[in-house]
């Protein structure tokens, strides 16, 4: 999953292109967090070098060091930690994959047929990478109350402002 951030010399990713805006924002926030961990510029000159694209060698090595934390399937035997997933046994009945999106109506909304603007069964399946980003976005943006999800680490709600400075 992280190896997609590494590219051939001169051909670096410039944007995320998920089919949903919330996944693009979650990806950008995750990338900002990773870069914050991997690059700790000491001063303005170091920041300028990073902005101008110098010193990417350390970035590739750092991403490789973090790769085990983003494992989606566990180890070779299918055991061990997985990205954004609990190690405890799951209880209850499984939810459809579209429940990973915070705008999906819950069981009560579907029972009352109040899901007029957000249709049910929009996403019958997701690829592995999309499912991982949807899981991360849910854990990053989950509001309080509602469908039985824990509130996100920032207290609920996906209100975010990302500023791109002009060079």
Spell out what each predicted region is:
Residues 1-167:
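Conserved small-residue
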């Amino acid at each position: 999953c992280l190896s997609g951030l590494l590219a051939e010399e001169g051909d670096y990713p410039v944007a995320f292109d998920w089919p949903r805006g919330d996944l693009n924002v979650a990806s950008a926030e995750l990338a900002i967090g990773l870069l914050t961990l991997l690059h700790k510029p000491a001063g303005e000159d170091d920041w300028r070098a990073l902005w101008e694209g110098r010193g990417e060698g350390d970035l590739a090595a750092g991403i490789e060091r973090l790769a085990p934390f983003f494992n989606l399937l566990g180890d070779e035997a299918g055991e061990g930690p997985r990205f954004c997933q609990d190690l405890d046994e799951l209880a209850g009945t499984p939810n459809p994959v579209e429940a990973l999106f915070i705008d999906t109506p819950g069981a009560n909304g579907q029972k009352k047929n109040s899901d007029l603007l957000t249709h049910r069964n929009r996403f019958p399946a997701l690829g592995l990478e999309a499912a991982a980003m949807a899981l991360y976005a849910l854990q990053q943006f989950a509001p309080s109350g509602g469908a039985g999800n824990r509130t996100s680490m920032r207290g609920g709600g996906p209100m975010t402002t990302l500023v791109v400075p002009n060079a």
